[in-house]
Amino acid sequence: ANWRRAGYFDKARLALIRGHVTDSRAKGNIIAYDATRDWLMLSSYHLTDERIPEYLKALENFQPDFLNIYPSSALQLAEYLQRHDQRWRTPLQGVLCGSEQLTLSQKRLLEGVFQCRVLRWYGHAERVVLAAEGTYSELFYFWPHYGFVEFGEPDADGLQEVIGTTFHNMAMPLVRYQTGDFVRLAKP
C-alpha cells in the first residue's frame, strides 16, 4: 500500500539496488533475478564508479517500471551521471527510497535525474513502525496498522524519539521499543 502512493501496481517490473548480496567477491556478479516476481536485484555493495556502467546497462536491458533503492545508492548513480555528463535513459514511473535518510534537496536532485516521483519512507529491520510521505504531501505519516507509535519527550531542539510496538511479531513482540530515531512532529 505504501508504494502505491508512487503509482506502484501489481506485476510492476521492479529493480532493487539494496543490501542484496549477489557475490562476495569485489569483482563478482552484481545481478540476481527473481523470476517469480520479475525483480532484478542488484548489489549495493558492488556499486562503485568503475562498475556503475554495468548497473546502467543491466537496468537499461531490464527496463523496470520502478527502482527500489537505498538513498545513498541513488545519489551515487545520480552524481555519477552528472559528473560524466550523461542522462538517465530508463523511463521510470517511480523511485522508492527508504532505510536511510534522504533530505528534500537530495530528493529534488534525484527527481531531476530520474525524471519521476521519488517516494521516501521510514522503517527499520525490526519492523516496529512504518512511515511514508503522503500522496500529496512530503510530510511523513505513520501507518497505524503496521505498529503502534508513540513519541518521547521533546528535547531542547523539539525532536522526539520514535517509540513503537510491533503488530508483526507475535512470538516475540517488541513493546514500547525505543528506536533511537528522532522526529519533529508537524501539524498536517
Predicted regions, residues:
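Conserved AMP-binding loop of ANL adenylate-forming enzymes
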Residues: R4-D34, L42-Y45, S99
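Conserved ATP-dependent adenylate/AMP-binding module captured primarily in the ANL superfamily
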Residues: A1-A12, I52-F62
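Active-site glycine/GP-rich loop and adjacent strand/helix microenvironment
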Residues: D34-P188
